[in-house]
């Protein structure tokens, strides 16, 4: 059924400042993105400002050619998303075909013609919402989530709705989206930190990478720079999809603020380069955007990515030069769809390599001058103590930090805490992390205690989740000394086993 948008898109949501091309007549108006979205909004009952926000997240309101992201197996950029509305066709998803069926337009028209693409996107979104359309913008959140392959996409769209957006397209059309009062759910409030402390862990589909135990001393010697050819959230969602069996990357950097998501552990091999010898010894970093649209290359993204590359270069002893920090184009051969030379140009001619490498070098010098980190495992000699109440357990050794853990069968009414001895070389601010193997019979309200310069403080964690990774416990001011200052409490208001496995401190 037809359903008029609640808000007049052309009046309240978008201001068209300049017409397309040199003429300002009817032909120019017919080709404006604002008009195309207005018509699609009216035809399918989808709020126009929602279409506009989605288009901004997808492509910054550009219409990339189909070749920009045609599906290719083993290629993290070739996810098969098309047009300003990022309609998808790959082995696990086909919103492009769905759009064709709903609108009666051919797949080729939707891939190549912007108005058809906008119409197809609106039709799919309306179909996902069901016959009874939501009565406000917040009500469309679930449909947007399903459209984009997960809640991360919806969150990115709704952040744009809340903040507003403005841009001039390559055709000269100026579009402005006014801020809206919408609710942006806080996703993953207890999300695990990635291997890189400034990243967030999102995970992978399980069949799109190679499990390994690469050693920092010798197994990683290259960093490969990529472009997503799509939005940040679409890349993260694709890498996390259980139906994706072909491609992944270790990290993905967001354009707007430099936020970093991790999809594959550094110790494992991501399928990002399309050339096994490169994959085997490299870390792949994706960057949100398109190779031919330099507006995506923000200062925030450059600086955040350079900080990450500097961290990796120091950690893995990677030389900071263009032989070891390379573009996807430099990867040898085209053995698969994801190969480099002759197959890819990313990050493309607009990527400022001089700026990027200078930032990496500057940050690496700072890291080398200020880096301090200590990891203490429950098996570290002279640095862990616990009463006989804590049993040595070799359960879940594949996701414990070391060969075992200490387990308290049930919380006690008295303090018999397990304690880790931590050395801090100078008074200052330190990040503290905990590690444990998770299990459903573990305690959901385990208490960590950290001794700061102001006394003992507590942090409660759920040990039923987030196992086998470093979990951020907070940043604290610690005194200069070497003492038992991080504990796992023997007391807990919850039920279940309490685990003491490993802790880590890092200078902030």
What are these regions (language model features)?
Residues 194-319, 409-411, 423, 439, ...:
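Active-site-adjacent loop/helix surface patches within enzyme catalytic domains
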Residues 453-481:
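Extracellular carbohydrate recognition and processing domains
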Residues 156-203, 291-373, 508:
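Basic/polar, cationic surfaces and motifs that engage anionic cell-wall
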Residues 1-27:
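Secretory targeting and sorting signals
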């Amino acid at each position: 059924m037809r359903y008029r948008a609640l808000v007049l898109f052309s009046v309240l949501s978008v201001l068209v400042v300049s017409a397309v091309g040199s003429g300002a007549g009817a032909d120019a108006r017919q080709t404006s993105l604002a008009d195309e979205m207005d018509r699609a909004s009216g035809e399918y009952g989808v709020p126009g400002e929602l279409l506009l926000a989605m288009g901004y997240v997808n492509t910054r309101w550009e219409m990339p050619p189909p070749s920009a992201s045609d599906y290719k197996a083993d290629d993290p950029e070739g996810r098969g998303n098309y047009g300003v509305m990022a309609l998808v066709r790959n082995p696990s998803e086909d919103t492009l075909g769905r759009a064709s069926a709903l609108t009666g337009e051919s797949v080729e028209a939707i891939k190549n013609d912007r108005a058809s693409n906008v119409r197809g996107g609106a039709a799919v979104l309306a179909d996902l919402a069901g016959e009874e359309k939501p009565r406000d913008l917040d009500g469309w959140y679930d449909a947007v989530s399903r459209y984009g392959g997960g809640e991360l996409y919806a969150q990115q769209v709704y952040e744009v709705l809340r903040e507003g957006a403005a841009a001039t397209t390559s055709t000269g059309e100026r579009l402005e989206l006014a801020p809206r009062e919408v609710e942006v759910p806080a996703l993953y409030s207890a999300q695990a930190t990635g291997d890189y402390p400034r990243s967030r862990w999102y995970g992978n589909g399980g069949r799109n990478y190679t499990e390994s135990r690469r050693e920092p001393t010798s197994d990683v010697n290259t960093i490969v720079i990529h472009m997503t050819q799509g939005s940040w959230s679409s890349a993260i969602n694709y890498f996390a999809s259980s139906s994706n069996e072909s491609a992944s990357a270790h990290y993905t950097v967001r354009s707007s603020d430099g936020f970093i998501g991790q999809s594959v552990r550094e110790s494992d091999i991501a399928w990002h380069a399309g050339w096994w010898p490169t994959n085997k010894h490299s870390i792949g970093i994706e960057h949100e955007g398109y190779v031919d649209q330099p507006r995506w290359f923000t200062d925030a993204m450059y600086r955040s990515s350079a900080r990450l590359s500097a961290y990796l270069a120091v950690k893995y002893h990677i030389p900071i030069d263009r032989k070891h920090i390379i573009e996807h184009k430099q990867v040898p051969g085209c053995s698969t769809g994801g190969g480099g030379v002759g197959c890819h140009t990313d990050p493309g001619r607009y990527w400022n390599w001089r700026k990027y490498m200078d930032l990496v070098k500057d940050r690496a010098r700072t890291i080398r001058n200020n880096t301090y980190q200590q990891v203490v495992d429950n098996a570290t000699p002279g640095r862990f103590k616990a009463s006989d109440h804590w049993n040595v357990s070799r359960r879940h050794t594949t996701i414990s930090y070391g060969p075992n853990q200490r387990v308290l069968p049930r919380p006690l009414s008295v303090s018999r805490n397990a304690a880790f001895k931590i050395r801090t070389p100078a008074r200052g601010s330190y990040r503290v992390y905990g590690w444990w193997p998770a299990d459903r019979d573990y305690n959901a309200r385990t208490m960590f205690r950290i001794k700061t310069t102001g006394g003992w403080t507590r942090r409660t964690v759920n040990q039923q989740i987030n196992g086998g990774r470093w979990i951020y416990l907070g940043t604290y001011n610690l005194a200069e000394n070497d003492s038992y200052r991080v504990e796992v409490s023997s007391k807990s208001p919850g039920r279940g086993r309490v685990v003491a496995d490993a802790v880590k401190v890092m200078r902030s």
